[in-house]
Regions:
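Bacterial N-terminal signal peptides that target proteins for export
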Residues: 1-9
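Bacterial N-terminal signal peptides
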Residues: 8-20
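Bacterial Sec-dependent signal peptides at the C-terminal "C-region" and cleavage site
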Residues: 19-27
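N-terminal pro-sequences and low-complexity stem/linker regions of secreted or lumenal proteins
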Residues: 26-507
Length: 507
């Protein structure tokens, strides 16, 4: 499943005093009914937060070589937990010989056999990808749990050695099979020669090495958390199991904003969709994950000017008319969401997706809206791509167990600690871009991206949606609200689009 850019533009309020912020950060496990201290009573410096979630990329996969970029480009070498070969102890030289962390498929059992992991399996290390297009590994429920521990997915002990197996298993069982039937694409990573714009922005502004997707499964459920801090038990897209067709009754953040009189919009890119010539709210609803919620279906009739085409974003940025909270959906029909290629009419090129994000961010930085905005870029889940850091324990949003597991799925018989919603998914990239974002800053606090909701709630004095967002950090540590470090934004390099794109070989 694809989709994904979410931007939030927030009328805000932040801090003249850091003591209340520290208190909020420490008081993370409050109930959903407990309203957060109204930061608007301090200094109103952020009026817009823009947040965007692209598709299916893990932290090691995209930013694993970030410290190497710093070494080569005169950035101070601060702590960042990327790929082990680029993550030596302070002052030591990089290893450059990546550890072989995942067993591969025994070559004696080629397709149509399933991937067999045994004593003859070659050990596979991470490596630099040359192609900017890869076949999609699956990050779904079963695969995510096998990634956690190949031989015992229900174990409390993560080994993170199942990535190659799941990549191979899915490739061999796809119809038609993928090229990479050995699953080694999951161990590939990119660096600044591929994603020069992202590497520059992550180095200049604020990022994190402990930022996780909310659920150990695929896109749809994670994006439900992005909007409402729960999927109400769904681990698959609604309707995967024919008996599970009900829309979510949980309150999305936009419903709460509407009730509180806080302006909001959802921007959708209609390119290459039927909405291109008819970008009405009713048409655009089909390309927004707000459609998963009952309340979302009231938008076309009741709030049609709040579900709008992406062209309106550029107009709002230019004219200084951004709403207080805005979410930008991914340009999936246009192939600009950075998702792995998966029966698409053409390969999905990450450089083209990054170029699209560049256009959104640069438009903001060059506009009158820059002075009081924050743009939060993240990814909806790790895409089944190797990451050396395991998922972390998390607060269940509402106590609901999985409701749509299929016969034979992991956790349908025996159970384990990752069988409900008390663990996050895997790490995903994050860049916080704002005149108030700290320069060259890495946050190390464990959080999933429902922390974006917590930031909104903190800024506006809103109650938490569920126990999950209530338990998150409020993200104020990413900012310096007293003195804006980036009153004048930097001039980033243009994102390269000259990389090779092919699916029929690796690397």
């Amino acid at each position: 499943m694809k989709q994904g850019l979410f931007h939030i533009v927030v009328l805000a309020l932040c801090l003249a005093f850091l003591s209340p912020v520290a208190a909020l950060a420490q008081n993370a496990e409050t109930s959903p009914q407990t309203a957060v201290t109204n930061m608007s009573q301090t200094v109103n410096v952020l009026n817009h937060i823009i947040f965007m979630a692209q598709e299916n990329r893990g932290l090691d996969h995209y930013f694993g070589a970030l410290r190497e970029y710093w070494r080569n480009n005169n950035f101070s070498d601060i702590s960042f937990d990327g790929l082990p070969q680029f993550n030596p102890t302070s002052g030591a030289a990089p290893l450059y010989r990546p550890p072989r962390t995942n067993p591969g498929c025994d070559p004696a059992y080629p397709p149509p056999n399933d991937c067999i992991e045994d004593k003859n399996s070659p050990a596979v290390a991470s490596y630099h990808l040359i192609t900017q297009c890869i076949e999609n590994p699956s990050p779904s429920w079963n695969e995510g749990h096998v990634d956690w521990n190949l031989h015992n997915p229900l174990s409390a002990s993560p080994t993170l050695n199942g990535y190659v197996y799941t990549g191979a298993h899915d490739a061999r069982n796809n119809d038609p099979p993928f090229y990479d039937t050995d699953g080694i694409r999951v161990m590939g990573y990119y660096d600044d020669t591929d994603l020069n714009y992202y590497y520059y922005m992550a180095s200049q502004f604020a990022t994190s090495d402990r930022w996780f997707s909310p659920v150990m499964t695929r896109t749809s459920s994670n994006r439900d958390y992005l909007i409402a801090a729960t999927s109400q038990g769904y681990v698959y897209p609604i309707g995967t199991d024919s008996k599970d067709q009900k829309l979510l009754t949980a309150k999305p953040i936009f419903q709460v904003l509407q009730s509180a009189g806080i302006s909001w919009k959802i921007y959708v890119n209609p390119e290459n969709s039927p909405c291109a010539s008819n970008p009405t709210a009713q048409c655009l609803l089909g390309y927004s994950y707000i459609q998963n919620f009952q309340w979302g279906h009231t938008i076309p009739q009741n709030f049609p000017n709040k579900l709008v085409p992406i062209s309106q974003y550029f107009t709002d940025v230019k004219n200084g008319t951004l709403p207080q909270v805005a979410m930008i959906e991914p340009a999936s029909p246009a192939g600009l969401d950075e998702h792995g290629s998966d029966s698409d009419p053409y390969p999905i090129n990450i450089q083209l997706g990054a170029k699209y994000v560049e256009s959104l961010v640069n438009a903001l930085m060059k506009s009158v809206s820059w002075k009081d905005s924050a743009f939060i870029l993240t990814y909806d889940e790790g895409g089944g791509l190797y990451d050396h850091v395991p998922a972390k324990p998390a607060q269940s949003p509402d106590g609901i167990k999985p409701v749509d597991l299929l016969p034979g799925d992991i956790c349908t018989g025996a159970t384990g600690p990752t069988c409900d919603f008390t663990y996050t998914g895997y790490r995903v990239p994050l860049i916080v871009i704002s005149p108030y974002a700290k320069k060259h800053y890495v946050n190390h606090q464990i959080a999933d991206y429902t922390a974006i909701l917590k930031l909104i709630e903190t800024l506006f004095g809103l109650p938490a949606l569920t126990n999950r967002d209530a338990a998150q950090i409020n993200m104020t540590a990413f900012f310096n609200f007293n003195i804006p470090p980036w009153k004048t934004p930097p001039t980033p390099p243009a994102q390269s689009t000259s990389g090779s794109c092919y699916l029929d070989q690796l690397p």
